[in-house]
């Protein structure tokens, strides 16, 4: 089921910056936010508790990639935190992903990273020695994630249709690298607008700097939300 709220990437160095940012939103505006490595490693589980107390939904973006036993144990800890969504690297393999599913349980959405949106096909071939096309590699990872019992994948909007054709229509596709119409691309190499992502079938979108660096974050958020839901 499509999430109507764009997920806001809280790419900040600490809690004070997060608080200053969230103060620009109405207190009753319940957001869906992404906590990544920088913020989580700086603040620890306390930042999750703070955001939950504010009533926000949380995608904890740590991209776990380790041996199955370690990942399963880590996921048990994340399950106790009560996050709404988290992820692993599909490159860790089916057994690792199955272990992640066991550890997290069924109450939270578990997705796998296929290829980072900053990765080009040339980089994939040179750095990872994967000689298929980028799209073929992404679809393969998505199929392995589905086999492992995950709910979906992180992928570029350019691959959503291919992934759903290769898996199922209810296999979740979360799309980062979203930029509003007319926005700067930044360091993302495979990007789309919110409307494009909606039309192509994305279930979740993640938006960071266009909102967090905006002079008027709440108005920008509402504009992106409207474009996403109108798409």
UniProtKB/Swiss-Prot annotation:
Any idea of its EC number?
Answer: 4.1.1.23
Pathway note = Pyrimidine metabolism; UMP biosynthesis via de novo pathway; UMP from orotate: step 2/2
One Gene Ontology cellular component annotation? Answer: cytosol
- Swiss-Prot/TrEMBL GO biological process terms: 'de novo' pyrimidine nucleobase biosynthetic process; 'de novo' UMP biosynthetic process
Tell me the Pfam families matching this sequence: OMPdecase
- Keywords carried by this UniProt record: Decarboxylase, Lyase, Pyrimidine biosynthesis
Positions binding substrate in this chain are 11, 34, 61-70, 117, 179, 188, 208-209
Checking PROSITE patterns in the record gives: OMPDECASE
List the catalysed reactions.
orotidine 5'-phosphate + H(+) = UMP + CO2
Q: Tell me the enzyme class.
A: lyase
Q: Which residues form the active site?
A: 63 (proton donor)
Query: What would be an example GO MF term here?
Result: orotidine-5'-phosphate decarboxylase activity
Show the coiled coil region(s): none
Which SUPFAM superfamilies does this one have?
Ribulose-phoshate binding barrel
The record, for NCBIfam families, names:
PRK00230.1, pyrF
UniProt subunit comment:
Homodimer.
Family that this chain belongs to? Belongs to the OMP decarboxylase family. Type 1 subfamily.
Record's function text: Catalyzes the decarboxylation of orotidine 5'-monophosphate (OMP) to uridine 5'-monophosphate (UMP).
The protein's name is Orotidine 5'-phosphate decarboxylase
The gene designation is: pyrF
């Amino acid at each position: 089921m499509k999430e109507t709220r764009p997920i806001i990437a809280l790419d900040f160095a600490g809690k004070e910056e997060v608080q200053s940012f969230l103060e620009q939103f109405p207190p009753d505006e319940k957001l869906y936010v992404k906590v990544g490595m920088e913020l989580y490693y700086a603040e620890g589980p306390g930042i999750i508790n703070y955001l939950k107390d504010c009533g926000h939904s949380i995608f904890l973006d740590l991209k776990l990639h380790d041996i199955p036993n370690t990942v399963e144990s880590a996921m048990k800890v994340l399950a106790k935190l009560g996050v709404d969504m988290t992820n692993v690297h599909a490159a860790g393999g089916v057994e690792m992903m199955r272990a992640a599913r066991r550890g997290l349980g069924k109450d939270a959405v578990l997705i796998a990273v296929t290829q980072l949106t900053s990765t080009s096909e040339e980089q994939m071939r040179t750095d990872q020695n994967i000689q298929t096309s980028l799209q073929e590699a992404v679809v393969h990872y998505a199929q392995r994630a589905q086999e492992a019992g995950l709910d979906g994948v992180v992928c570029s909007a350019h691959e959503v249709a291919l992934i759903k054709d290769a898996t199922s229509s209810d296999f979740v596709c979360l799309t980062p690298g979203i930029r509003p119409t007319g926005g700067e691309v930044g360091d993302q190499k495979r990007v789309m607008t919110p409307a494009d992502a909606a039309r192509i079938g994305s279930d979740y979108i993640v938006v960071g700097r266009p909102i967090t660096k905006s002079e008027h974050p709440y108005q920008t958020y509402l504009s992106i939300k409207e474009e996403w839901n109108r798409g």
